[in-house]
Amino acid sequence: MNWDDTTDATADERLVGASADREDQAVEAALRPKDLDEFIGQEKVREQLDLVLRAARARGATSDHVLLSGAPGLGKTTLSMIIAAEMGAPIRITSGPAIQHAGDLAAILSSLQEGEVLFLDEIHRMSRPAEEMLYMAMEDFRVDVIVGKGPGATAIPLELPPFTLVGATTRAGLLPPPLRDRFGFTAHMEFYEPHELERVIHRSAGLLDVEIDSRGAAEIAGRSRGTPRIANRLLRRVRDYAQVKADGVITREIAAAALKVYEVDARGLDRLDRGVLEALLKLFGGGPVGLSTLAVAVGEERETVEEVAEPFLVREGLLARTPRGRVATPAAWAHLGLTPPPRATGGNGQGDLFGA
């Protein structure tokens, strides 16, 4: 393998990346389920959320504030829109990075209608002053707006209409306890099972007017990393291949051939993932090897290897992070069809000078 091939495999460009690009955002709007009955997967979350929303409607009150955590692409934004739809309320969408000052948040909160849903994505990235203002807004439906500066500054209380905050985060551990405690309902979104992704793919194919058989859907689902967003993206690329190279019908063979062109293998690994594994196995005998050394060997930044490639490899049981460095598992050797050397025993070797 040419190690230079992986140098442009950034998180935003990866076909199997979970972050949404502009095409994803446009297509997801058309594919997004409108209510809880249409939403596929996350059975426990759906059941619990349904109870919360039904009870709120029965009381004629706004819903409790909701915190949704989990990896990108699992449906947090979709659920926020479903919450608004189920409550018959409008929704306002913003994100933590967009709220850097308390005044930014005050402007949004003061313009909310009664019962409106405020969706705050990446809530863990909100600034501390805005975060502290949110405490009072969530609990008492009021904020204190500071007018003036220095000794002459005064706090003017501003009453807010009752609203529902839906916060979404990929890093729930970064939320301070006072903020987490103010959410009446908290749910963690799990990765999807293959059979759930098959249902997602069949539904999306119907909406996109794409003909696909059950084995074709299963082939795509198996490479989708447990993430509906990735499943829908792979479906679109396989659709393109089927239209150009075949009769437009997606079968298992067509799906496999298409994803081979796009370099997504049977377990959902792409060029960057395989580059990391091949370097670890072929150059370092399976490890342990330090992260910095491994990144140099792959031709990527340390952060790219650690934050983009490694999480999925660890989740798949192909790579282990140890105090002495990165170590390939027996499953990694098997996946690449390689035979481990006699001393590749899962981390008993000597680490390198760069550390883990």
Curated annotation (Swiss-Prot):
Residues annotated to bind ATP: 31-32, 73, 76-78, 139-141, 182, 192, 229
Assigned EC number: 3.6.4.-
Entry's Gene Ontology BP terms: DNA recombination; DNA repair
SMART domains reported for this sequence: AAA
Region annotated Head domain (RuvB-H), chain positions: 266-356
Coiled coil start-end: none
Binding sites annotated in the UniProt record for DNA: 302, 321, 326
Localization (cell): Cytoplasm
DNA damage found in the keyword field: yes
Binding site residues for Mg(2+): 77
Region (Large ATPase domain (RuvB-L)) residue spans: 4-192
Catalytically driven reaction(s): ATP + H2O = ADP + phosphate + H(+)
GO molecular function: ATP binding; ATP hydrolysis activity; four-way junction DNA binding; four-way junction helicase activity
Gene Ontology cellular-component terms listed: cytoplasm; Holliday junction resolvase complex
PANTHER family referenced in this protein's UniProt entry, alphabetically: HOLLIDAY JUNCTION BRANCH MIGRATION COMPLEX SUBUNIT RUVB, PTHR42848
Family named by the database record: Belongs to the RuvB family.
Domain notes: Has 3 domains, the large (RuvB-L) and small ATPase (RuvB-S) domains and the C-terminal head (RuvB-H) domain. The head domain binds DNA, while the ATPase domains jointly bind ATP, ADP or are empty depending on the state of the subunit in the translocation cycle. During a single DNA translocation step the structure of each domain remains the same, but their relative positions change.
Subunit structure: Homohexamer. Forms an RuvA(8)-RuvB(12)-Holliday junction (HJ) complex. HJ DNA is sandwiched between 2 RuvA tetramers; dsDNA enters through RuvA and exits via RuvB. An RuvB hexamer assembles on each DNA strand where it exits the tetramer. Each RuvB hexamer is contacted by two RuvA subunits (via domain III) on 2 adjacent RuvB subunits; this complex drives branch migration. In the full resolvosome a probable DNA-RuvA(4)-RuvB(12)-RuvC(2) complex forms which resolves the HJ.
Role: The RuvA-RuvB-RuvC complex processes Holliday junction (HJ) DNA during genetic recombination and DNA repair, while the RuvA-RuvB complex plays an important role in the rescue of blocked DNA replication forks via replication fork reversal (RFR). RuvA specifically binds to HJ cruciform DNA, conferring on it an open structure. The RuvB hexamer acts as an ATP-dependent pump, pulling dsDNA into and through the RuvAB complex. RuvB forms 2 homohexamers on either side of HJ DNA bound by 1 or 2 RuvA tetramers; 4 subunits per hexamer contact DNA at a time.
Name recorded for this polypeptide: Holliday junction branch migration complex subunit RuvB
Record organism: Streptomyces avermitilis (strain ATCC 31267 / DSM 46492 / JCM 5070 / NBRC 14893 / NCIMB 12804 / NRRL 8165 / MA-4680)
Biological classification of the source: Bacteria, Bacillati, Actinomycetota, Actinomycetes, Kitasatosporales
